[in-house]
């Protein structure tokens, strides 16, 4: 948005708290000419290109309050700055909310991910655990099956799968575990196994989960 507006010679302030969704990952994927770049490299290149347009400026800050109405807004930030503007564009994106599972924080962004389109290639043909339940289970099973045939679904204690959903997963030889997850065991950020409360240990080298 800042690039397009800068090229249109509009005065723009980008208020950015420098905590993007993908900050925990080592690489970003799916962007032509930037596939495999780290999030920091990607943002650095983006800012350098946008900085060539003199009407765009960046503020490493967080907006805390907006007052006024269309054509005359005031934006205040945590650092005490105040900006007057005619228009406001929200480009806040999404935030992943990791599940409350022991050991997930240590592997999140290294060998445990949310998006198979973003990180599935790197885990292709590996043994994976998919932490998901309900309608999302069938969707994730279809998506993951294109990356690997070796995957297991853990519902983490949820009993939201219908008999029809379980039967369809069974037809595709997908094993489903219903017990709550006790922990995700890892070494240096790489998943080794997922352990359930009933003592079942599922060896794997990667995890996908749905917040």
Across the structure, where does each feature detected by a protein language model lie?
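Rossmann-like dinucleotide/flavin-binding elements
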Residues: 1-17, 108, 114-163
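Short amphipathic alpha-helical segments
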Residues: 2-3, 26, 100-103, 141-143, ...
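Conserved N-terminal glycine-rich FAD pyrophosphate-binding loop of Rossmann-like flavoproteins
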Residues: 4, 17-41, 165-172
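FAD-binding core/adjacent interface of flavoenzyme oxidoreductases
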Residues: 13, 57-126
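Glycine/Thr-rich phosphate-binding loops of Rossmann-like dinucleotide-binding domains
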Residues: 23, 98-99, 204
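Helix-loop-beta segment of a Rossmann-like dinucleotide-binding subdomain
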Residues: 24-39, 65, 72-75, 125, ...
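A Rossmann-like FAD-binding core segment of flavoenzymes
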Residues: 44, 50-69, 75-77, 82-83, ...
């Amino acid at each position: 948005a800042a690039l397009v507006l800068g090229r249109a010679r509009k005065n723009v302030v980008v208020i950015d708290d420098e905590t993007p969704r993908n900050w925990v990952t080592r690489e970003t994927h799916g962007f032509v000419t930037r596939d495999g770049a780290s999030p920091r490299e990607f943002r650095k290149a983006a800012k350098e290109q946008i900085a060539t347009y003199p009407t765009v400026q960046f503020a490493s800050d967080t907006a805390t309050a907006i007052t006024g109405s269309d054509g005359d807004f005031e934006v205040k930030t945590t650092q005490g700055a105040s900006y007057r503007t005619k228009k406001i564009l929200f480009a806040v994106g999404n935030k992943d909310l990791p599940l409350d599972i022991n050991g997930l924080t240590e592997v999140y962004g290294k060998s445990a991910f949310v998006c198979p389109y973003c990180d599935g290639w790197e885990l292709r043909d590996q043994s994976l655990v998919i932490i998901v339940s309900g309608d999302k289970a069938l969707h994730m099973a279809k998506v993951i099956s294109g990356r690997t045939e070796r995957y297991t679904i853990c519902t983490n204690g949820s009993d939201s799968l219908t008999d029809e959903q379980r039967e369809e997963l069974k037809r595709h030889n997908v094993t489903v575990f219903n017990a709550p997850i006790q922990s995700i065991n890892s070494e240096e950020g790489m998943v080794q196994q997922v352990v359930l409360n009933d003592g079942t240990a599922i060896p794997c080298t990667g995890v996908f989960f749905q917040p």
